[in-house]
Design a protein with these regions (language model features):
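Conserved beta-loop-beta/alpha segment of the NTase-like Rossmann-fold superfamily
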Residues: 1-45, 70-73, 78-82
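Aromatic (phenylalanine/tyrosine) cluster motif
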Residues: 3, 192-194
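Short, solvent-exposed polar/charged micro-motifs at secondary-structure junctions
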Residues: 6, 36-39, 116-120, 153
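N-terminal glycine-rich phosphate-binding loop and ensuing alpha1 helix
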Residues: 9-10, 121, 195
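Catalytic-core segments of class I nucleotidyltransferases/pyrophosphorylases
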Residues: 16-19, 48-148, 159-160
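Short, amphipathic C-terminal "tail helix"
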Residues: 155-156, 161-187
Length: 195
């Protein structure tokens, strides 16, 4: 799974707070044209999950569950009680269904300003790669530049970023990091994440 959009870090931080405050698990949904290819979430107007269906023939919504989950600490005990599926695997769907049965599962639906890219097949991985290439080529901005993210979040300072630039050397990536260091790129909160 790949996620790209404005404010992703804020969404993640808010989700941690939601789970801690409400003691409920949280999943995310993304509108798709072909929900039968995915796990589908149905919810009420308050974001409470009503149902989860895996690749339904007649989906109850167009929102696919995107594979990003937040759980309260009780998930440890929940996971210990999960039985292997018919495929002899412990399934995350079983964990989510356990929280659903207890009415402790909420969903946040990503809006149209956010992109979720499923990369579970060769074709979808190619589509995701082409998407990334197009964005980077058109904007000149890097997607998922770990040094940029670390710098903007305050995990490294300007001196450390400069040390990294010197280590990388004189190339396109190094030039991009110089622009970040010098404040030329000031696009805030556009993050990309692989999950």
């Amino acid at each position: 799974n790949m996620f790209y959009g404005s404010g992703f870090t804020k969404i993640l931080k808010r989700s941690v707070q939601d789970v801690e405050k409400n003691n409920k698990a949280k999943v995310f949904g993304y509108y798709v044209n072909n929900p039968s290819r995915y796990g589908v979430v149905e919810n009420d107007e308050k974001g409470n999950v009503i149902s989860l269906e895996e690749k339904p023939k007649n989906p109850k919504s167009n929102y696919a569950v995107v594979g990003l989950y937040f759980y309260p600490n009780e998930v440890i005990q929940t996971a210990k009680n999960i039985k292997p599926s018919q495929r002899r695997e412990l399934e995350i769907t079983s964990v989510n269904n356990s929280f659903l049965k207890e009415k402790k599962l909420i969903v946040e639906l990503f809006d149209k300003n956010f992109t979720w890219l499923d990369s579970g097949t060769h074709e979808s991985m190619l589509e995701a790669s082409n998407y990334i290439h197009t964005i980077e080529k058109r904007t000149g901005l890097k997607i998922a530049c770990i040094e940029e993210i670390a710098y903007k979040l305050g995990y490294i300072n300007k001196k450390k970023l400069n040390d990294i630039i010197n280590y990388i050397g004189d190339n396109q990536y190094g030039e991009y990091l110089k622009k970040i260091k010098d404040g030329i790129w000031k696009v805030e909160n556009w993050w990309f994440s692989f999950m």
